[in-house]
Protein backbone atom coordinates (compact mmCIF):
# COMPACT_ATOMS: atom_id res chain seq x y z
CA UNK A 1 0.00 0.00 0.00
CA UNK A 2 2.64 2.50 1.06
CA UNK A 3 4.86 1.41 -1.84
CA UNK A 4 1.99 2.07 -4.25
CA UNK A 5 1.53 5.56 -2.82
CA UNK A 6 5.27 6.26 -3.07
CA UNK A 7 5.59 4.98 -6.65
CA UNK A 8 2.50 6.93 -7.73
CA UNK A 9 3.91 10.07 -6.10
CA UNK A 10 7.28 9.59 -7.73
CA UNK A 11 5.64 9.14 -11.14
CA UNK A 12 3.57 12.31 -10.73
CA UNK A 13 6.62 14.27 -9.55
CA UNK A 14 8.66 13.11 -12.54
CA UNK A 15 5.84 14.30 -14.83
CA UNK A 16 6.15 17.74 -13.19
CA UNK A 17 9.87 17.72 -14.05
CA UNK A 18 9.08 16.74 -17.66
CA UNK A 19 6.55 19.57 -17.90
CA UNK A 20 9.17 21.98 -16.55
CA UNK A 21 11.59 20.85 -19.26
CA UNK A 22 8.93 21.48 -21.90
CA UNK A 23 8.30 24.97 -20.53
CA UNK A 24 12.04 25.69 -20.39
CA UNK A 25 12.41 24.66 -24.06
CA UNK A 26 9.91 27.36 -24.99
CA UNK A 27 12.06 30.04 -23.33
CA UNK A 28 14.41 31.24 -26.03
CA UNK A 29 18.14 31.50 -25.42
CA UNK A 30 20.56 33.18 -27.81
CA UNK A 31 21.34 29.85 -29.48
CA UNK A 32 19.35 28.25 -32.28
CA UNK A 33 17.60 25.03 -31.27
CA UNK A 34 14.72 23.31 -33.13
CA UNK A 35 12.70 22.85 -29.92
CA UNK A 36 12.22 26.63 -29.77
CA UNK A 37 9.60 26.23 -32.51
CA UNK A 38 7.81 23.27 -30.86
CA UNK A 39 4.86 25.41 -29.79
CA UNK A 40 4.34 27.00 -33.23
CA UNK A 41 1.07 25.89 -34.83
CA UNK A 42 0.62 26.29 -38.59
CA UNK A 43 -2.74 26.57 -40.34
CA UNK A 44 -2.61 23.51 -42.60
CA UNK A 45 -5.71 22.85 -44.71
CA UNK A 46 -7.82 24.72 -42.18
CA UNK A 47 -6.58 23.04 -39.01
CA UNK A 48 -3.84 24.05 -36.57
CA UNK A 49 -0.93 21.64 -37.00
CA UNK A 50 2.44 21.62 -35.19
CA UNK A 51 5.26 22.99 -37.35
CA UNK A 52 7.22 19.75 -36.91
CA UNK A 53 4.45 17.88 -38.77
CA UNK A 54 4.54 20.05 -41.89
CA UNK A 55 8.25 20.86 -42.19
CA UNK A 56 11.76 19.79 -41.29
CA UNK A 57 13.45 22.12 -38.76
CA UNK A 58 17.26 22.02 -38.59
CA UNK A 59 20.07 24.15 -37.20
CA UNK A 60 22.17 25.90 -39.89
CA UNK A 61 24.60 27.51 -37.47
CA UNK A 62 24.67 28.67 -33.84
CA UNK A 63 22.26 31.52 -34.56
CA UNK A 64 20.10 30.30 -37.48
CA UNK A 65 17.36 27.71 -37.92
CA UNK A 66 16.40 26.33 -41.32
CA UNK A 67 12.84 25.23 -42.08
CA UNK A 68 12.16 23.06 -45.14
CA UNK A 69 8.40 22.70 -45.68
CA UNK A 70 7.22 19.45 -47.22
CA UNK A 71 4.80 21.39 -49.43
CA UNK A 72 5.74 24.66 -51.16
CA UNK A 73 2.28 26.19 -50.82
CA UNK A 74 2.53 26.24 -47.01
CA UNK A 75 5.59 28.57 -46.84
CA UNK A 76 3.54 31.77 -46.24
CA UNK A 77 1.49 30.01 -43.53
CA UNK A 78 4.67 28.93 -41.72
CA UNK A 79 6.05 32.48 -41.91
CA UNK A 80 2.80 33.88 -40.53
CA UNK A 81 2.73 31.33 -37.68
CA UNK A 82 6.31 32.11 -36.63
CA UNK A 83 5.65 35.85 -36.64
CA UNK A 84 2.42 35.39 -34.64
CA UNK A 85 4.19 33.31 -31.98
CA UNK A 86 5.48 35.39 -29.07
CA UNK A 87 9.08 34.29 -29.70
CA UNK A 88 10.23 37.56 -31.29
CA UNK A 89 11.56 35.83 -34.42
CA UNK A 90 11.48 37.18 -37.99
CA UNK A 91 11.71 34.48 -40.67
CA UNK A 92 13.46 35.14 -43.99
CA UNK A 93 12.18 33.19 -47.02
CA UNK A 94 14.38 32.26 -49.97
CA UNK A 95 12.37 30.19 -52.42
CA UNK A 96 10.93 27.25 -50.52
CA UNK A 97 13.45 27.45 -47.64
CA UNK A 98 12.75 29.54 -44.55
CA UNK A 99 15.68 30.78 -42.46
CA UNK A 100 15.02 31.99 -38.94
CA UNK A 101 17.90 34.06 -37.53
CA UNK A 102 18.04 34.25 -33.73
CA UNK A 103 18.35 37.85 -32.59
CA UNK A 104 20.83 38.63 -29.82
CA UNK A 105 19.16 38.82 -26.44
CA UNK A 106 19.37 42.18 -24.72
CA UNK A 107 20.12 42.33 -21.00
CA UNK A 108 16.51 43.35 -20.37
CA UNK A 109 15.16 40.43 -22.41
CA UNK A 110 17.47 37.99 -20.62
CA UNK A 111 16.25 39.18 -17.24
CA UNK A 112 12.64 38.84 -18.39
CA UNK A 113 13.29 35.27 -19.55
CA UNK A 114 15.05 34.44 -16.28
CA UNK A 115 12.05 35.79 -14.39
CA UNK A 116 9.77 33.59 -16.52
CA UNK A 117 12.03 30.56 -15.93
CA UNK A 118 11.94 31.16 -12.17
CA UNK A 119 8.14 31.39 -12.26
CA UNK A 120 7.96 28.09 -14.17
CA UNK A 121 10.34 26.47 -11.67
CA UNK A 122 8.27 27.69 -8.74
CA UNK A 123 5.15 26.32 -10.41
CA UNK A 124 6.89 22.92 -10.74
CA UNK A 125 7.92 23.04 -7.06
CA UNK A 126 4.33 23.80 -6.06
CA UNK A 127 2.99 20.89 -8.09
CA UNK A 128 5.60 18.57 -6.52
CA UNK A 129 4.56 19.75 -3.06
CA UNK A 130 0.91 19.17 -3.97
CA UNK A 131 1.77 15.59 -4.88
CA UNK A 132 3.47 15.24 -1.48
CA UNK A 133 0.38 16.64 0.25
CA UNK A 134 -1.87 14.17 -1.57
CA UNK A 135 0.43 11.25 -0.72
CA UNK A 136 0.55 12.21 2.96
CA UNK A 137 -3.25 12.49 3.00
CA UNK A 138 -3.51 8.97 1.57
CA UNK A 139 -1.13 7.67 4.26
CA UNK A 140 -3.17 9.41 6.98
CA UNK A 141 -6.32 7.78 5.60
CA UNK A 142 -4.64 4.38 5.91
CA UNK A 143 -3.81 5.10 9.56
CA UNK A 144 -7.36 6.28 10.20
CA UNK A 145 -8.72 3.05 8.70
CA UNK A 146 -6.22 1.17 10.90
CA UNK A 147 -4.58 -0.46 7.89
CA UNK A 148 -1.09 0.69 8.97
CA UNK A 149 0.47 1.69 12.29
CA UNK A 150 1.57 5.19 13.28
CA UNK A 151 5.20 4.06 13.06
CA UNK A 152 4.60 3.04 9.44
CA UNK A 153 2.95 6.42 8.88
CA UNK A 154 6.02 8.28 10.16
CA UNK A 155 8.36 6.11 8.10
CA UNK A 156 6.23 6.64 4.98
CA UNK A 157 6.07 10.40 5.60
CA UNK A 158 9.88 10.53 5.87
CA UNK A 159 10.30 8.54 2.65
CA UNK A 160 7.79 10.74 0.81
CA UNK A 161 9.66 13.82 2.06
CA UNK A 162 12.96 12.39 0.74
CA UNK A 163 11.37 11.79 -2.66
CA UNK A 164 10.00 15.35 -2.62
CA UNK A 165 13.42 16.78 -1.72
CA UNK A 166 15.00 14.83 -4.58
CA UNK A 167 12.57 16.25 -7.15
CA UNK A 168 12.74 19.81 -5.78
CA UNK A 169 16.55 19.55 -6.09
CA UNK A 170 16.08 18.48 -9.74
CA UNK A 171 13.93 21.58 -10.33
CA UNK A 172 16.62 23.78 -8.77
CA UNK A 173 19.31 22.12 -10.90
CA UNK A 174 17.27 22.61 -14.09
CA UNK A 175 16.60 26.24 -13.19
CA UNK A 176 20.26 27.05 -12.53
CA UNK A 177 21.22 25.39 -15.85
CA UNK A 178 18.59 27.46 -17.70
CA UNK A 179 19.72 30.67 -15.97
CA UNK A 180 23.33 29.92 -16.91
CA UNK A 181 22.22 29.25 -20.49
CA UNK A 182 20.29 32.53 -20.63
CA UNK A 183 23.16 34.61 -19.24
CA UNK A 184 25.68 33.25 -21.79
CA UNK A 185 26.51 35.81 -24.43
Swiss-Prot record:
Classification via InterPro entries: Ribosome_recyc_fac, Ribosome_recyc_fac_dom, RRF_sf
This protein's major location comes to cytoplasm
The entry's cellular-component GO terms read: cytosol
Top-level taxon in the UniProt lineage: Bacteria
Q: Name one GO biological process term.
A: cytoplasmic translational termination
Q: Name one Pfam family in it.
A: RRF
Q: Which gene encodes it?
A: frr
Q: Indicate what this protein is called per its UniProt record.
A: Ribosome-recycling factor
* Family matches, as PANTHER family: MITOCHONDRIAL RIBOSOME RECYCLING FACTOR PSEUDO 1 (PTHR20982:SF3), RIBOSOME RECYCLING FACTOR (PTHR20982)
Q: Name one GO molecular function term.
A: ribosomal large subunit binding
